[in-house]
Amino acid sequence: MSRVAKAPVSIPAGVEVTLNGQEITVKGGKGTLTRVINSAVAVTVEDGAIKFAPVEGVVNAWAQAGTARALINNMVVGVSQGFEKKLQLVGVGYRAKVAGSDVDLSLGFSHPLVHKLPAGVTAECPSQTEIVLRSIDKELVGQVAAEIRGYRPPEPYKGKGVRYANEEVRRKEAKKK
């Protein structure tokens, strides 16, 4: 059994947490996040920490409590520090540039791709082959990074494509005659 839910989430200085029924709101220096917690989890805010307990009689209450703890911890870290994902473009002629709330991608197709960024996510290109996505919402920044990577995932023979900065692409050997 996982014991994730037994550890409380500490609230750092400058972060304010309000609980309204099953809806939790976290405010910090970088913004505000709100989430509705599953009814199988009892959440309490006391002594500068958020504590979680499963509701008695619910089958998967411990699992839901662990999930709620992880989600709320990500909210607290997001509003205090923020999250970022780095993408690399590997391939001849693969380029990216940011224009307002759009990321213009040239990935070897006959047409350029334009990816619209959702509200709350910012992008920058330190070079033509790098994209840095930032947000206070870990789930959202990961989703946007996955969507951009999905346009041209790294292929195993030459390694060309869009990859995460820390991703290792397994390479295959070419077919022998």
Swiss-Prot record:
What are the UniProt keywords, alphabetically? Answer: Ribonucleoprotein, Ribosomal protein, RNA-binding, rRNA-binding
Report the GO molecular function annotations. Answer: rRNA binding; structural constituent of ribosome
* Record flagged with keyword RNA-binding: yes
The keyword Amino-acid biosynthesis is assigned to this record: no
Q: Which GO terms describe its cellular component?
A: cytosolic large ribosomal subunit
BP GO annotations = cytoplasmic translation
InterPro entries to which the protein is assigned, alphabetical: Ribosomal_uL6-like, Ribosomal_uL6-like_a/b-dom_sf, Ribosomal_uL6_a/b-dom, Ribosomal_uL6_bac-type, Ribosomal_uL6_CS
Taxonomy, superkingdom = Bacteria
What is the recorded function of this protein according to its Swiss-Prot or TrEMBL entry? This protein binds to the 23S rRNA, and is important in its secondary structure. It is located near the subunit interface in the base of the L7/L12 stalk, and near the tRNA binding site of the peptidyltransferase center.
Which NCBIfam families has this protein been placed in?
Answer: L6_bact
Its assembly, as annotated, is: Part of the 50S ribosomal subunit.
Q: To which protein family does this belong?
A: Belongs to the universal ribosomal protein uL6 family.
Q: What is this protein called?
A: Large ribosomal subunit protein uL6
Q: Which organism is it from?
A: Shewanella amazonensis (strain ATCC BAA-1098 / SB2B)
Gene (name only): rplF
